[in-house]
């Protein structure tokens, strides 16, 4: 009946009975998640959620109140779609992590890779593989991103053929971007996609090695965007090849800062978790590298000043400056008028002084503290209080 009498049973006996009756399911965790670089995790504003949108089941859900991603690995169908659309690389494919993929790609040097889903029905295919074509079986047909594709292309030095009837949106956009890049550089397509047997035969007959495209790099411990940037920088090779349009799923952009209103509070730097915006302590400036920017817009939302930082999303510029840090804003440090220690930027001090000075109603001590470091502020105020007490005592 599903009812059990537990009267007279000890706690251990009850627990053992529940364990015996509870169903047990075995499942694999196909996705690895790094919350430290996730662009949804604990953000004040929702700026990303592509993985949830890409998931065909309820394996990934958003917890809007805490801005946490909730994973149900038992509901995962192992398609890998979430991995291909993750902009920062916070999601990685556990079956073939990026580092493992790079090592496997090295084995394809001098070969033309034919990517085939492990679940594909190959028995009914009547296809003869040309010389130098080597199949690459993948269990998740939609995990391939632009980083995976460029890694395989450069390590092999040849075009890549994908045989997949229902290619994922993230992988489709990645193929489009990589093809644009190769057409500008080599005047050749990089990836040939075949969705049926006839197209597969055609793609295999066309696939070839691309002279001057083979390149190997160590990807260990590098984030997703930086891997792609390093490989792309080598391909550009100091030339100006033009621009590549990007999509909503794979976004790039450039950040601009109005130096007249920027106080170098570094809120934008703290908001950027992919290190596209960095504070340069040597020059006391904010520098920006567009090749790793995901165009999330969180820097705009985090800026304390009005009309100061602007994001211009849309394209990848195939030129040397796209891969280097450029200065967006700079200011000199302000020295404490008491001890001479530099403690803040000049613009920040001047802005606070302009706001607070009218509120201090000519109080010389308080006005002085606006230009002092934290240590000297206290000293100035204590001295002012002691002087006031001394004056009151002397005046009776």
Regions from the PLM with identified roles:
Residues 164-169, 194-198:
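Short beta-alpha junction loops
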Residues 145, 157-161, 167-188, 291-302, ...:
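C-terminal, active-site-flanking charged/polar segments
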Residues 35, 63-162, 168-180, 326-396:
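Iron-sulfur-cluster electron-transfer modules
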Residues 50, 56-81, 87-88, 92-108, ...:
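Basic, glycine-/proline-tolerant helical and adjacent loop/strand elements
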């Amino acid at each position: 009946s599903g009812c059990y009498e537990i009267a007279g049973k000890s706690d251990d006996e009850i627990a053992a009975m529940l364990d015996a009756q509870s169903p047990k399911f075995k499942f694999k965790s196909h996705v690895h998640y790094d919350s430290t670089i996730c662009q949804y995790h604990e953000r004040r504003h929702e700026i990303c959620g592509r993985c949830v949108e890409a998931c065909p089941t309820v394996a990934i859900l958003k917890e809007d109140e805490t801005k946490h991603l909730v994973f149900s690995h038992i509901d995962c169908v192992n398609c890998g779609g979430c991995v291909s659309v993750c902009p920062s690389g916070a999601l990685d494919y556990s079956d073939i992590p990026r580092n493992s993929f790079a090592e496997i790609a090295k084995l394809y040097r001098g070969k033309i890779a034919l990517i085939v889903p492990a679940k594909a029905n190959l028995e009914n295919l009547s296809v003869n593989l040309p010389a130098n074509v080597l199949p690459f079986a993948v269990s998740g047909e939609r995990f391939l991103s632009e980083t995976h594709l460029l890694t395989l292309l450069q390590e092999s030095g040849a075009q890549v053929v994908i045989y997949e009837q229902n290619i994922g949106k993230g992988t489709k956009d990645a193929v489009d971007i990589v093809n644009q890049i190769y057409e500008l550089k080599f005047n050749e397509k990089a990836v040939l996609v075949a969705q049926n047997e006839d197209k597969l035969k055609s793609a295999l007959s066309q696939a070839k090695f691309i002279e001057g495209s083979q390149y190997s790099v160590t990807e260990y411990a590098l984030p997703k965007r930086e891997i792609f940037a390093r490989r792309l920088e080598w391909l550009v090779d100091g030339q100006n090849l033009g621009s590549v349009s990007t999509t909503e799923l794979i976004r790039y952009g450039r950040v601009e800062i109005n130096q007249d209103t920027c106080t170098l509070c570094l809120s934008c730097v703290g908001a950027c978790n992919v290190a596209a915006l960095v504070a340069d302590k040597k020059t006391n400036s904010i520098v920006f590298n567009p090749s790793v920017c995901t165009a999330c817009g969180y820097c705009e939302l985090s800026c304390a000043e009005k009309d100061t930082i602007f994001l211009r999303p849309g394209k990848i510029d195939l030129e040397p400056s796209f891969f280097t840090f450029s200065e967006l804003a700079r200011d000199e440090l302000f020295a404490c008028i008491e001890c001479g220690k530099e403690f803040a930027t000049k613009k920040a001090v001047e802005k606070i002084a302009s706001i607070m000075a009218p509120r201090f109603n000519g109080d010389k001590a308080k006005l002085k503290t606006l230009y002092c470091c934290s240590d000297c502020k206290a000293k100035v105020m204590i001295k002012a209080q002691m002087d006031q007490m001394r004056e009151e005592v002397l005046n009776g």
